[in-house]
């Protein structure tokens, strides 16, 4: 540095002068030779008190310089005075007492806190008074708002009663709030928005709970208060309530008042009110006014609902031209949805494909599908409604609708309309025209071809033309392999041919394509039932019952399967569910009676058989059981009415009239029994049983006709015997050929010998009454002699007071018949 000179030596100011000069106190090389320093290191002599135990804080107030610090001088080992000490009793300046940011608290070991956060929040300037009126008003207002919110939440959750209670509570507290606010502040400070929300919520909850009078009163309070702005709109709500009450004139009045108070800038709200007015006009039958309302809506803001209602109104007045124009307006309503091509990937870009897959079934796409389905439903319904009336014939009307649809954005609906045209032909029982219409689709695209072939297959199936049905079912399946209806029809044709296993496979495939195809599920249950796979059949019908909870057919099938599985208790339980759905089904009631009868519960069986008889008094099996029940319970006179009805239903069956006569005889009305037997003999002169009873009654009563009837009886029995011999000989000679000629009395009484009593012969006749193979038989009918044997035992013989001796029955067989009585 001595050889480098950046400025002339003659310069008076040397920039580097004194650079090499330094205080000898900083010379660390001489510390080893410094006696004072070494002594201070080895001992505590001259050591300064520790002041770095904690970081000093700047948040403590600055100490006063005078008379507060230490008065002694602290000297370092080098003899240099310590910073901040007072030397020789001379007071130093105040700014030199301590370093900036430090305080006396540092000497006590406090933490460094320059922002003063350890002291906490600043104390309030004034203590909070919770009992002040303003604070009470604020708390009460907060509580009212909470109650209104809770009321709305309860309403959205479906708890209407709780919502109304919360709304009432909010109304009560709001009135208290208004009174307190009036006492504390001026009336201008009242919270009108809170009052409006409380009253409006209360009226809404009243309306939701169908308390319409209270709701109207609350709305009136709001509407009449001029301080509420836009309260006139609530007249729409009042009109809705009057509409629910069917007070249509007042509803229209309030709708129009609301329409007058709503400015024209609120176009959407005005359109909705006009739509309500149009619907109210329809309900009152004022179709012309309704047409005007809907036409105005269609000119301002066309919509599907307004267009459909316009068509209905025009149809009601029968105006063909207006119906056509309204249909065209409905077709022209814009759907405002994206085309299906948007959801088809134009390239192999994975990012684009992923995006399309994400939006293919999102909420917007679902909404578009629903809107399109609703539009198609409205158009199809309107076309089916007006097609038969807009032209001279429904076929011409359908053709006009099809042409209009083809020229619109709903081109695919034209084929559906054609199929509906075929169905209309079917309703008119014009089978050939329906078939011709459906055959037109054989050259169309696969979807339409499959639908048409499915209908044709079903039509031929109903006509029992199973070959044609199978052919068109194959065509439908080939056109659309995933058409569950086509597969079901194919299964039906196979089922009709008796191939149940193959039919089950078609039904299974239909269910794989559409698990909600109830027809296939029902048919597969029937198929399993035919195959005697009852567990699988029951499983199918139980699945179907989960889908169709109130289907009588499904309930009946489940009950029948349990009956086949010999579980009568379960069968009874399901039949009880069935009659809860169709309480007037006589077959279900009679089946319940049969099951209870098989279980031995006669009283329950009688109850359900009697209910079945009330709903269908022409069921012979039920009549037969009821008659046998009354005979079994020894009320023969009550059984008469049932057997008389049976004789009216089957007048050629002699057994019912014999039962009536037998009931008269057992009830002690012998004269009526005699008259009945005579009437039976007049209608059926060759009936042996009737003649036997006539002989018996005439003998008991002592009438002179006994010989006449006895002679006829002998002749009939002899003829019957000769006929049987002739039949037997003919059978022996011809190898068992049977004769077709039979007596009207039947062969059941001819097997008795002459020694048998008349009661035994009658018992044998009556045992056939409740046949053993009938579905509605009484469980004990095989042992009950319903007409011929008295359940209490043989009748007591009448006293023999007649002068004439009784003729023994066995004498009939001992007498010889003349040649004139023998058959030719």
UniProtKB/Swiss-Prot annotation:
GO terms for molecular function: kinesin binding. It is linked to Defects in Ift88 are the cause of recessive bilateral polycystic kidney disease (PKD) with collecting duct and tubule ectasia, and a liver lesion involving biliary dysplasia and/or portal fibrosis. SUPFAM superfamilies: TPR-like (SSF48452). Testis. Residues 809-824 have a biased composition (Acidic residues). Pfam families: ANAPC3, TPR_12, TPR_6, TPR_8. It is found in: Cytoplasm, Cytoskeleton, Microtubule organizing center, Centrosome, Centriole; Cytoplasm, Cytoskeleton, Cilium basal body; Cell projection, Cilium; Cytoplasm, Cytoskeleton, Microtubule organizing center, Centrosome. This is Intraflagellar transport protein 88 homolog. Residues 748-757 have a biased composition (Polar residues). Disruption phenotype: Cilia absent or reduced, virtually no cilia of the normal 5 uM mean length. Conditional knockdown in preadipocytes results in loss of cilia. Mutant mice show a significant reduction of gonadal white adipose tissue and total fat mass associated with reduced serum LEP levels. Positively regulates primary cilium biogenesis. Also involved in autophagy since it is required for trafficking of ATG16L and the expansion of the autophagic compartment. Residues 1-27, 111-134, 721-824 are annotated as: Disordered. It comes from Mus musculus (Mouse). One of its GO terms (cellular component) is kinocilium.
């Amino acid at each position: 540095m001595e050889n480098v000179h950046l400025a002339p030596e003659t310069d008076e100011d040397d920039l580097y002068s004194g650079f090499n000069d330094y205080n000898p106190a900083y010379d660390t090389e001489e510390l080893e030779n410094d006696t004072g320093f070494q002594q201070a290191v080895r001992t505590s002599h001259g050591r300064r008190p520790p002041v770095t135990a904690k970081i000093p804080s700047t948040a403590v107030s600055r100490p006063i310089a005078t008379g507060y610090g230490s008065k002694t001088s602290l000297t370092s080992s080098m003899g240099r005075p310590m910073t901040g000490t007072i030397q020789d009793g001379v007071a130093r300046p105040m700014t030199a007492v301590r370093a900036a940011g430090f305080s006396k608290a540092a000497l006590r070991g406090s933490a460094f806190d320059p922002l003063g956060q350890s002291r906490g929040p600043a104390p309030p300037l004034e203590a909070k008074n919770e009992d002040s009126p303003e604070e009470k008003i604020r708390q009460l207002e907060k509580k009212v708002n909470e109650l209104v919110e809770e009321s709305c939440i309860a309403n959205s959750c479906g708890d209407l009663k709780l919502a109304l209670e919360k709304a009432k509570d909010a109304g009560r507290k709001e009135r208290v709030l208004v009174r307190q606010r009036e006492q504390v502040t001026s009336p201008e400070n009242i919270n009108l928005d809170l009052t409006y929300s409380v009253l409006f919520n209360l009226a809404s909850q009243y309306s939701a709970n169908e308390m319409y009078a209270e709701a109207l009163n609350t709305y009136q309070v709001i509407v009449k208060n001029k301080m509420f702005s836009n309260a006139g709109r609530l007249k729409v709500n009042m009109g809705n309530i009057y509409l629910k009450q069917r007070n249509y004139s007042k509803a229209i009045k309030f709708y129009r008042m609301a329409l007058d108070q709503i400015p024209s800038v609120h176009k959407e709200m005005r359109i909705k009110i006009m739509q309500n007015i149009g619907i109210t006009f329809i309900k009152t039958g004022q179709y012309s006014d309704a047409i005007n309302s809907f036409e105005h809506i269609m000119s301002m803001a066309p919509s599907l609902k307004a267009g459909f209602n316009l068509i209905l109104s025009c149809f009601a007045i029968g105006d063909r031209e207006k119906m056509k124009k309204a249909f065209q307006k409905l077709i022209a309503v814009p759907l405002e949805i994206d085309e299906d091509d948007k959801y088809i990937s134009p390239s192999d870009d994975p990012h684009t494909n992923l995006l399309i897959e994400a939006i293919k079934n999102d909420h917007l796409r679902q909404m578009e599908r629903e809107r399109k389905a609703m539009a198609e439903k409205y158009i199809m319904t309107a076309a089916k409604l007006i097609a038969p009336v807009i032209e001279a014939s429904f076929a011409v009307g359908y053709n006009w609708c099809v042409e209009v649809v083809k020229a619109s954005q709903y081109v695919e609906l034209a084929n559906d309309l054609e199929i509906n045209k075929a169905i209309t032909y079917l309703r008119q029982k014009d089978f050939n025209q329906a078939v011709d219409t459906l055959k037109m689709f054989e050259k169309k695209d696969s979807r339409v071809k499959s639908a048409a072939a499915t209908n044709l297959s079903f039509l031929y199936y109903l006509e029992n033309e199973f070959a044609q049905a199978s052919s068109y079912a194959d065509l439908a399946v080939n056109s659309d392999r995933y058409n569950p209806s086509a597969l079901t029809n194919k299964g039906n044709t196979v089922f009709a041919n008796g191939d149940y296993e193959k039919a089950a496979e078609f039904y299974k495939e239909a269910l794989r394509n559409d698990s909600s195809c109830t027809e296939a599920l029902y048919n597969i249950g029937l198929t399993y039932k035919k195959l005697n796979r009852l567990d699988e059949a029951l499983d199918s019908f139980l699945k179907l019952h989960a889908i169709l909870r109130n289907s009588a057919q499904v309930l009946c099938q489940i009950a029948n399967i349990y009956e086949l599985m010999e579980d009568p208790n379960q069968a009874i339980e399901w039949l009880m569910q069935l009659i809860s759905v169709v309480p007037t089904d006589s077959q279900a009631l009679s089946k319940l009676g049969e099951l209870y009868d098989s279980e031995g519960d006669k009283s329950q069986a009688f109850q359900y058989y009697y209910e079945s008889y009330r709903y269908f008094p022409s069921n012979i099996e039920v009549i037969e059981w009821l008659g046998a029940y009354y005979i079994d319970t020894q009320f023969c006179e009550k059984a008469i009415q049932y057997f008389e009805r049976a004789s009216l239903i089957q007048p050629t069956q002699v057994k019912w009239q014999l039962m009536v006569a037998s009931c008269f005889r057992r009830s002690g009305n012998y004269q009526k029994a005699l008259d009945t037997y005579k009437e039976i003999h007049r209608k059926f002169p060759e009936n042996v049983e009737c003649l036997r009873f006539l002989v018996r009654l005439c003998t008991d009563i002592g009438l002179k006709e006994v010989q006449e009837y006895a002679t006829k009886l002998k002749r009939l029995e002899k003829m019957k015997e000769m006929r049987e011999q002739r039949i037997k000989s003919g059978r022996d000679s011809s190898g068992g050929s049977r004769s077709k000629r039979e007596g009207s009395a039947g062969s059941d009484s001819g097997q008795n010998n002459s020694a048998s009593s008349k009661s035994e012969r009658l018992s044998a006749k009556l045992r056939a009454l409740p046949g053993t193979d009938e579905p509605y038989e009484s469980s004990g009918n095989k042992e009950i002699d319903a007409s011929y044997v008295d359940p209490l035992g043989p009748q007591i013989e009448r006293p023999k007071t007649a002068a004439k001796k009784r003729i023994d029955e066995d004498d009939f067989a001992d007498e010889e018949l003349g040649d004139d009585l023998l058959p030719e």
